[in-house]
């Protein structure tokens, strides 16, 4: 039954369980801390590469040309927007883990993001990432490294 629940429903079950059994709150906090204090560099790199290469061309087409309320939007600008949107969840996760003091996980996350960007440094023609420009992965990596420095995340 639990396996068929959505993530939101699982969260509701956890909230109800902790409310009903406050003694489980300590264990739930311990498990949450353990989860947030670790990050797999390889998994993060895979997720970043998949997120960037998985942006559909239809999304680019929907944002280029004449756009109501914006005027004409060039394909490079639209591609950049889409690429930035794809990388934003990883940047947000980095900020969250740094704010929580999970420095090892934050460091691993930075390395994973940069590794994922390195993997897609030569995107295939016709991909949204290619439309964004050949320097896009390196510019995004620089942005992540700047964010890490601003957050005080040390990279080994």
PLM features: residue spans?
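Amphipathic alpha-helical packing elements
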Residues: 1-24
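Eukaryote-biased, non-catalytic alpha-solenoid scaffold regions
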Residues: 22-156
């Amino acid at each position: 039954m639990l396996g068929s629940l959505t993530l939101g429903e699982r969260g509701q079950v956890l909230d109800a369980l902790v409310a009903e059994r406050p003694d489980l709150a300590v264990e739930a906090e311990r498990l949450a801390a353990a989860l947030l204090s670790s990050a797999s560099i390889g998994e993060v790199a895979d997720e970043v590469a998949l997120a960037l290469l998985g942006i559909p061309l239809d999304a680019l087409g929907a944002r280029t040309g004449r756009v109501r309320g914006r005027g004409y939007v060039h394909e490079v600008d639209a591609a950049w927007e889409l690429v930035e949107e794809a990388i934003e969840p990883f940047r947000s996760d980095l900020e969250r883990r740094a704010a929580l003091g999970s420095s090892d996980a934050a460091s691993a996350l930075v390395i994973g993001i940069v590794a994922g960007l390195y993997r897609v440094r030569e995107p295939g023609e016709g991909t949204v990432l290619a439309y964004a420009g050949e320097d896009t992965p390196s510019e995004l990596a620089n942005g992540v490294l700047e964010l890490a420095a601003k957050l005080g995340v040390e990279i080994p």
